[in-house]
């Protein structure tokens, strides 16, 4: 059994070696500063109106000249053969086949070659109409397709077009994302330029575009420029997190901003606002009719050739400029909570009065007032990317964490202040000489130390089942290891001061800009907080092992907001399940899954923000009366 009082980052009794991990940060010191106020062309309709190309004994009859005039050079396919129509420049493929049956239910089959009709906007699999898909890929967008019901000839119409680099990158990332979802235990959302994206495009070049493969290998550099520029579609991460074991040569990594692959489709100019294709993220390469034109793509030309009418004032508005977040709801590059400071991602508060006052000359060059912003919350409970030791590696889905060297900790994105709550952790890998301490922590718990090191956290250790609080270890149960599923229950009374309080609005805090995002900066007063801690009667923490209640671990714990927390020693790997479905749901008590705190926190913070504006004089920048 380890000696009580082990130091930060150090497994008790294991020696000081691996524990000496210096604090790291994802920010360069000079990059944080106070913030001062201050479509691809659609396919031509002339093609669809051309005389129909009827299947014949290997020849394209009638309408050949018209197709050549419009497209410049097309390949015509039929069920009996393939002929090449000679023309200049771009080569494309067109097909008219006898109709199969229209998919009445319009069901999607992601991962298959699907085609969207440019008139009715319904989706069909290519096999429905017997279309040759040997030169096609799933999630392609460089085509024009009319189903047999919509096309004037009564036949299906399919034209494969030349793809630009943006469309090729979009298709490649969509296919890589789908493959990872279906094949990997922990799906990835970001992919290496050299190891994933370039090899995929090189392998499937002929399937992705009708353009000839270039003789010079300059296109890999061009796709990097394309994805780095198209930030309304692609995510870019140029370097690994500080302390990460990811090799630098795997970067830059790219991913899709919108992870809903069903949004990917061709940019038809007659697409209706009520169509099945979502305009989220502009993944279809254009802005659908009826779109408001908001977001980063708003400055580009609309489908009718005009501009969005965005004024100079709107472009320079620092408050409501679009702030696009990755699929998991947090910027890829961000400041870490460290050195006595905490950072809360901010977004414009739509309920703030008079946001246009920033346009007044008197505000030029001055910091943006914090009451015009609010804490940016994600509706899912996940592991926090910023509220962790930088050396810990978090998976793309933010549900798995891998340890590194000495003990260090990560907290969840949401905490609880009252009621009974539960979550599970599965030990995926626990090699010899590794360990874990799992449990609950308040926001001020030391991230560069094992859970249970200070007064703000309570933990259960894998070795010998020891429980820890204030670095004092006591026997609790048998230990746990690889393959075990552990449950964590907490019950906090409803009548405490913390339980009756609304969450902090942070509106009286300074706004800090880092990598194009704004954050509230909050100073930690650990010593003052420790002295003000008081025990909460009738509160308790219980741990479970493979569905078996191990007994009450702690009673009358300190009052505060508690977050699910994980601390790992060396290369241990665990996955967390916030619910609502658990492998071993407790049957001996009532609880709510931690996943319920996702929307619960949104409601609480919204109420706090609205009350702030109602009860506080905005120009005075005074804290709400319920805050100390």
Curated annotation (Swiss-Prot):
Predominant cellular place of this UniProt entry's protein: nucleus
Bias-annotated ranges (Low complexity): 36-65
Cellular component annotations (GO), alphabetically ordered: histone methyltransferase complex; MLL1 complex; MLL1/2 complex; MLL3/4 complex; nucleoplasm; nucleus; Set1C/COMPASS complex
Recorded consequence of changing residue 296 to K: Abolishes methylation
Changes after translation: Both monomethylated and dimethylated on arginine residues in the C-terminus. Arg-296 is the major site. Methylation is not required for nuclear localization, nor for MLL complex integrity or maintenance of global histone H3K4me3 levels.
ZnF (C4-type) residues: 117-150
Compositional bias ranges of the Basic and acidic residues kind: 235-252
Oligomeric form and interacting partners: Interacts with HCFC1. Core component of several methyltransferase-containing complexes including MLL1/MLL, MLL2/3 (also named ASCOM complex) and MLL4/WBP7.
Annotated function: Transcriptional regulator. Component or associated component of some histone methyltransferase complexes which regulates transcription through recruitment of those complexes to gene promoters. Component of the Set1/Ash2 histone methyltransferase (HMT) complex, a complex that specifically methylates 'Lys-4' of histone H3, but not if the neighboring 'Lys-9' residue is already methylated. As part of the MLL1/MLL complex it is involved in methylation and dimethylation at 'Lys-4' of histone H3. May play a role in hematopoiesis.
Name of the protein described by the UniProt record: Set1/Ash2 histone methyltransferase complex subunit ASH2
Source lineage: Eukaryota, Metazoa, Chordata, Craniata, Vertebrata
């Amino acid at each position: 059994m380890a000696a009580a009082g082990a130091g930060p980052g150090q497994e008790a009794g294991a020696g000081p070696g691996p524990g000496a991990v210096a604090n790291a940060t994802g920010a360069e010191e000079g990059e944080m500063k106070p913030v001062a106020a201050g479509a691809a062309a659609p396919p031509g309709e002339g093609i669809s109106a051309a005389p129909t190309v009827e299947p014949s004994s290997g020849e394209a009859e009638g309408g050949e000249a018209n197709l050549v005039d419009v497209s410049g050079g097309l390949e015509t396919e039929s069920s009996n053969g393939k002929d090449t129509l000679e023309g200049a420049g771009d080569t494309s493929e067109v097909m008219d086949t006898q109709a199969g049956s229209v998919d009445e239910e319009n069901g999607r089959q992601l991962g298959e070659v699907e085609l969207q009709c440019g008139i009715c906007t319904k989706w069909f699999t290519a096999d429905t109409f017997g279309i040759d898909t040997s030169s096609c890929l799933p999630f392609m967008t460089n085509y024009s397709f009319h189903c047999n019901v919509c096309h004037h000839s009564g036949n299906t119409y399919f034209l494969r077009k030349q793809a630009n680099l943006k469309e090729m990158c979009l298709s490649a990332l969509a296919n890589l994302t789908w493959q990872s979802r279906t094949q990997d235990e922990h799906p990835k959302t970001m992919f290496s330029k050299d190891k994933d994206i370039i090899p995929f495009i090189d392998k499937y070049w002929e399937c992705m575009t009708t353009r000839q493969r270039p003789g010079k290998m300059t296109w890999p550099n061009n796709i990097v420029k394309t994805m780095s520029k198209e930030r309304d579609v692609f995510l870019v991460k140029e370097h690994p997190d500080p302390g990460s074991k990811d090799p630098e040569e795997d970067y830059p990594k790219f991913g899709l901003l919108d992870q809903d692959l069903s949004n990917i489709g061709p940019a038809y100019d007659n697409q209706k606002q009520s169509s099945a294709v979502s305009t989220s993220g502009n993944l279809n390469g254009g802005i659908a009719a009826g779109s408001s034109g908001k977001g980063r793509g708003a400055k580009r030309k609309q489908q009718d050739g005009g501009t969005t009418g965005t004024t100079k004032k709107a472009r320079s508005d620092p408050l409501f400029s679009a702030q696009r977040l990755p699929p998991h709801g947090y910027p890829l590059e961000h400041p870490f909570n460290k050195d006595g400071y905490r950072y809360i991602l901010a977004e414009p508060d739509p309920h703030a009065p008079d946001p246009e006052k920033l346009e007044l000359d008197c505000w030029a060059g001055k910091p943006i007032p914090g009451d015009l912003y609010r804490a940016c919350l994600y509706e899912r409970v996940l592991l926090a990317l910023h509220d962790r030791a930088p050396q810990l590696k978090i998976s793309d889905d933010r549900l798995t964490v891998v340890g590194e060297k000495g003990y260090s900790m990560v907290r969840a994105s949401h905490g609880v202040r009252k009621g009974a709550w539960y979550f599970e952790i599965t030990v995926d890998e626990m090699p010899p000489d590794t360990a874990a301490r799992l449990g609950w922590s308040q926001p001020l718990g030391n991230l560069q130390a094992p859970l249970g090191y200070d007064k703000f956290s309570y933990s259960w250790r894998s070795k010998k089942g020891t429980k820890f609080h204030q670095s004092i270890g006591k026997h609790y149960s048998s230990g746990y290891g690889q393959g075990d599923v552990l449950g964590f229950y907490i019950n906090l009374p409803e009548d405490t001061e913390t339980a009756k309080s609304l969450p902090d609005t942070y509106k009286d805090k300074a706004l800090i800009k880092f990598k194009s995002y704004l954050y509230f900066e909050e100073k930690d007063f650990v010593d003052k907080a420790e002295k003000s801690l008081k025990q909460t009667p009738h509160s308790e923490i219980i741990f479970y092992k493979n569905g078996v209640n191990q007994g009450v671990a702690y009673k009358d714990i300190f009052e505060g907001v508690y977050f699910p927390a994980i601390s790992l020693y060396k290369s241990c790997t665990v996955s967390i399940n916030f619910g609502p479905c658990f492998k071993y749901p407790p049957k001996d008590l009532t609880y709510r899954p931690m996943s319920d705190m996702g929307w619960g926190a949104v409601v609480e913070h919204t109420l706090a923000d609205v009350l702030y504006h109602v009860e506080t004089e905005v120009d005075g920048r005074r804290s709400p009366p319920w805050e100390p």
